[in-house]
Amino acid sequence: AEGVTCFDINASCAGFLKAMEVAAAGIHAGLYRHVAVVAAELSSKGLRWDDLDTCTLFGDGAAAAILGPAREGEGILAIRNATYSEGADLSVMVAGGSRLNMRTPPDDPNDYLFAMNGRALLRLIQTHFPPFLEELLRDGVDVIIPHQASAVGLGFLRKQLARRAGPAPVVID
């Protein structure tokens, strides 16, 4: 459509959730009445298929949602996410951006493909997730939709919830 605001939120597999957060904020601020959030990811083109620990966690996908004003107490009530910079090199695509591009290619062509150190990421999660969860649950969350593809990671989430007193939120995986 002509004259409609449109922009890209490049946040990899978390892009859809981040776009919903931005859209909800725009609606809440009165900038927009309705927002179409469209996400697509073609992970299969950037995976190393010889790395079974990583390639089995990712797939191609797409999703779309139309967001609009909600009644009081409905809609997206809260979003909590965090980034821990010490894990920046644990889940990367080294080449393909501005540092190692087509004019300054990397020495190893595999640098154009996604690489992940799953064990180190799990250790990072085990360090940061308990305080993150405590802060999240202070507000009486009923449902958690984690951004987690790993069965080990989801198991860790469930164990952390089981250790808490009182009713645990539903985990949608």
Give residue ranges: language-model regions:
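Phosphate/pyrophosphate-binding loops at sites that engage ATP/ADP/AMP, CoA/4′-phosphopantetheine
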Residues: 130-142, 161-164
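Glycine-rich phosphate-binding loops at beta-strand->alpha-helix junctions
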Residues: 141-160
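Acidic-glycine-rich active-site phosphate/pyrophosphate-binding loop
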Residues: 1, 37-43, 98-105, 154-169
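Acidic, glycine-rich active-site loops and adjacent beta-strand->loop/helix elements
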Residues: 11-16, 39-44, 82-84
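Conserved catalytic cysteine-centered active-site region
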Residues: 1-35, 159-173
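Condensing-enzyme catalytic core mediating Claisen C-C bond formation in acyl metabolism
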Residues: 49-123, 127, 131
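Flexible, glycine-rich active-site loops centered on histidine and acidic residues
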Residues: 24-62
